[in-house]
Curated annotation (Swiss-Prot):
This is Glutamate 5-kinase. One of its GO terms (biological process) is L-proline biosynthetic process. Pathway: Amino-acid biosynthesis; L-proline biosynthesis; L-glutamate 5-semialdehyde from L-glutamate: step 1/2. Catalyzes the transfer of a phosphate group to glutamate to form L-glutamate 5-phosphate. It is found in: Cytoplasm. Residues 280-358 form the PUA domain. ATP binds at K14, T173, D174. Belongs to the glutamate 5-kinase family. It comes from Pseudomonas putida (strain ATCC 47054 / DSM 6125 / CFBP 8728 / NCIMB 11950 / KT2440). HAMAP family: ProB (MF_00456).
Length: 372
């Protein structure tokens, strides 16, 4: 299983705020230098590398003399705008000592939700990697709104792994990995070395929240691993305080928790759909429709839909759930929620007589649908 790590050619590495700051007292240049040494070694070993770096808000808080992460959006954005410049300067300076360059990429959810912007971002990232530049990615905290937040950089890293078709996502954290119990309370807790990302038993052991400087706890890291798995990437959740951890991962040491995907790489359009987190509504399917999607790779027809929830327009993303409420798929709707309400449970031939026109015979076409 660890051959999936040593043989991975394209890595996305996510480093959290706690690993880049000196106990909340600004950026830790010494720690950043050690990370850079390891990432440069990966590049020289032929690994294509994309860095997702937290730390902008924490760096800005330090500059402003704040010791507690603010909850108000305007204060967070002010700290991010101040700290982002210092964060990028620090990475560029450190990589520059090894003759490498970095490029700043700031993303919002809209950049990945829009197909054209998604493709432009992917093209830019691939070009930078081909040029030997290390892209440094962060959420564009300064302009983002609650409605289009990724929520945490673990999720952003997973979507970037999807975007660049990475083989491996490395999420560096303040824990050594995922444990079968909370090691802070249970000295008998055992590290989970390997598991399937979709293993439901992991949910019970992924409790807890992020630290004072960051947003993501173990639950968000598990969720990120599952997002990355949709595009065929493996994920390592591993302690960032383990000495030379990236070097040792590349050498094949059995460290951290390796979460593996159920399926292989999806086609490019399906990758975009799988990583499209902003959903506008829900379609509740009957058992026959669930079977048609899962076993026969069929489109979703109106006759197989029992209920429409939410408000969405034609072309927006909807979630498809079975009678038990479990998500089956997600895809782009051919009809608005109002139109869908009128045609569900009906045959495709009846659409025109009900609506006065027929855009498509399917509610969601299979080319715009991805199983989850």
């Amino acid at each position: 299983m660890r051959s999936k790590v040593t043989g991975a050619k394209r890595w996305v590495v996510k480093i959290g705020s706690a690993l880049l700051t000196a106990d909340g007292k600004g950026l830790d240049r010494g720690a950043m230098a050690v990370w850079v040494e390891q990432m440069v070694a990966l590049r020289e070993a032929g690994v294509e590398l994309v860095l997702v770096s937290s730390g902008a808000v924490a760096a800005g808080m330090s500059q402003l003399g704040w010791t507690k992460r603010p909850s108000a959006m305007n204060e967070l954005q002010a700290a991010a705008s101040l700290g982002q410049m210092r964060l990028v300067q620090a990475w560029e300076s450190s990589f520059g000592e090894h003759g490498k360059h970095t490029a700043q990429i700031l993303l919002t959810h809209d950049d990945l939700s829009d197909r054209k912007r998604y493709l432009n971002a992917r093209s830019t990232l691939r070009t930078l990697v081909d040029l030997g530049v290390v892209p440094v990615i962060n959420e564009n905290d300064t302009v983002v709104t609650d409605e289009i937040r990724f929520g945490d950089n673990d999720t952003l890293a997973a979507l970037v792994a999807n975007l660049v078709e990475a083989d491996l996502l490395v999420i560096l954290t303040d824990r050594d990995g995922m444990f079968d119990a909370d090691p802070r309370n249970n000295p008998e807790a055992q590290l989970i070395y390997e598991a399937r990302a979709d293993d439901p038993s992991l949910d019970a052991v992924a409790g807890g929240t992020g630290g004072a400087l960051g947003r993501g706890g173990m639950q968000t890291k598990l969720r990120a691993a599952r997002l990355a798995a949709r595009s065929g990437a493996h994920t390592i959740i591993i302690g960032g305080r383990i000495e030379r951890v990236l070097d040792r991962l590349k050498a094949g040491e059995r460290l951290g928790t390796l979460l593996s995907p159920e399926r292989g790489m999806l086609a490019a359009r399906k990758q975009w759909l799988a990583g499209h987190l902003q959903t506008r509504g829900t379609l509740v399917l009957d058992a026959g429709a669930v079977q048609a999607l899962r076993q026969a790779n069929k489109s979703l027809l109106p006759v197989g839909v029992k209920t429409v929830q939410g408000s969405f327009r034609r072309g927006e993303m909807v979630v498809c759930v079975g009678p038990d409420g479990v998500e089956v798929a997600r895809g782009l709707a051919n009809y608005s929620a109002l139109e869908a309400q009128k045609i569900i449970g009906q045959s495709s031939e009846a659409i025109e007589s009900i609506l006065g026109y027929s855009a498509e015979p399917e509610l969601v076409h299979r080319d715009n649908l991805v199983l989850v």
